[in-house]
Amino acid sequence: MSGSVITGLYFNKVEGADNGSLKMGGMGELPDDPHLMLTAREDLGNGWYTGAQLQNRFYPDSGTFRSNGYLFDAQSRLFVGNDQIEFSFGRMAGLTVAGRPYSVYGKTNANMTFASLGGIAPANIMFQPGDLSNAIAFSTNAQSGLFVRGVYSNGDSVNGTDTETTEDWSDRRHVAQFSTGWTGDHLKTAVVYSFEMPGNVKNADGTRPGERKKNTHAVHLIASYDFGGPAVSGILYASQNDWRIGPVNDLSAIVGGSDVVSNSEEGLDNL
């Protein structure tokens, strides 16, 4: 059992504003989110192990859960592996996030804020799929040298019917990410390919919520270099039909309202 209760102060000033404000650090704005984590691990012999991990994030000022409807919103996964590779099944984050379990930003030291500060942290301004249910993931376990990671989720929507019809499957949100890279003593690099098929589950009356959205394709090129104290990192990002900026599908707040997004088949193209 492990966990943390973290809070702090930070100064925030919007560009063009006359004054800034001093605020308490909230969820995603600290080096680690306040959380409780339960981990169990069993040695199977011959270098193999298996286990389970449950993690819940909460607000330290009120004690309330971060996500309504989830007892363990951050992680609820089973894993099995050895010294070379690990496989996970359940609910977990994708690869382009700040935290556990398979963050490529963390692996390459590319997230210098160690949090999700708005406008600064890469996980908050480029594609990341959020926490994924019904996910399968893998990661090689080498501490240095070549690494490979991947994750796939067939959707976490609770809308629509429970029958596994072809339409139900095709209308659920699907996410896949694949990454490979190299970590050395000083230089660390990685490339991440991301795919998202936006969900289009029917409303209760049988109608669709809007136009069918085109699939998102995105690529991150990531690198960092440690000079033995000071370090520098950089990320090049390109995407086609992006529907989210960070973990939230909130493109409507950027391009001029929900009607614009709902009636469009194409998302943003970024470079």
Predicted region positions:
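Outer membrane beta-barrel
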Residues: 1-11, 23-157, 172, 181-188
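Detector for outer-membrane/organellar transmembrane beta-barrel domains
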Residues: 171-173, 177-271
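Flexible, solvent-exposed coil segments and beta strand-coil junctions
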Residues: 14-17, 115-118, 156, 251-258
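Gram-negative outer-membrane beta-barrel proteins
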Residues: 9-19, 58-64, 95-99, 156-162, ...
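Flexible, surface-exposed loop regions and adjacent strand-edge segments
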Residues: 19-20, 68-71, 105-110, 207-209, ...
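Glutamate identity and glutamate-enriched acidic tracts
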Residues: 15, 29, 42, 86, ...
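Outer-membrane beta-barrel domain signature
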Residues: 23-27, 61-67, 122-129, 160-169, ...
